[in-house]
């Protein structure tokens, strides 16, 4: 419901984003389990197991996972599904910052959201927290460079 708006605002702020619905490589665009079988709701666990590593599913997974590796931050836009939650958990485990934006009318309380960096309920607050984190990360990188003398006048 809010996906396109959030994506547009982040792009307008000059953030490079990954749009899983419209990736740059259009051949990988629009993966859906329904592409493999018309009635996935009737699948048994065994049916799912057999299709989990279908070439189309594997290509889509690799595309998404590559984007996760390349990302600096993750925005978990609520409400969302299991895949988004798995991605956010993996990214946090990799030490990346994860911001939750909950635009639902009635939130579903979740204790594990405490592990993430911020829980916002307004898009403007999300943008501010990303900007603050970006600036903080830049400062830390600058300090690290200066600490190792790679940016000092002595090396010129």
Where are these regions (language model features)?
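Conserved catalytic or regulatory cores that recognize and/or transform ribose-phosphate-containing ligands
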Residues: 1-156
């Amino acid at each position: 419901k809010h996906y396109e708006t959030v994506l547009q605002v982040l792009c307008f702020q000059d953030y490079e984003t990954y749009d899983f619905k419209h990736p740059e490589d259009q051949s990988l665009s629009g993966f859906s389990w329904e592409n493999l079988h018309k009635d996935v709701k009737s699948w048994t666990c065994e049916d799912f197991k057999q299709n989990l590593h279908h070439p189309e599913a594997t290509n889509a997974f690799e595309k998404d996972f590559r984007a996760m590796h390349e990302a600096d931050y993750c925005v978990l836009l609520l409400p969302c599904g299991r895949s988004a939650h798995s991605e956010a958990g993996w990214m946090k485990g990799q030490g990346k910052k994860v911001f939750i934006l909950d635009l639902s009318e009635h939130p579903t309380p979740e204790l594990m959201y405490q592990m993430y960096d911020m829980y916002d309920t307004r898009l403007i607050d999300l943008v501010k927290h990303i900007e603050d984190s970006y600036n903080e990360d830049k400062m830390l990188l600058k300090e690290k460079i200066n600490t190792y003398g790679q940016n000092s006048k002595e090396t010129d």
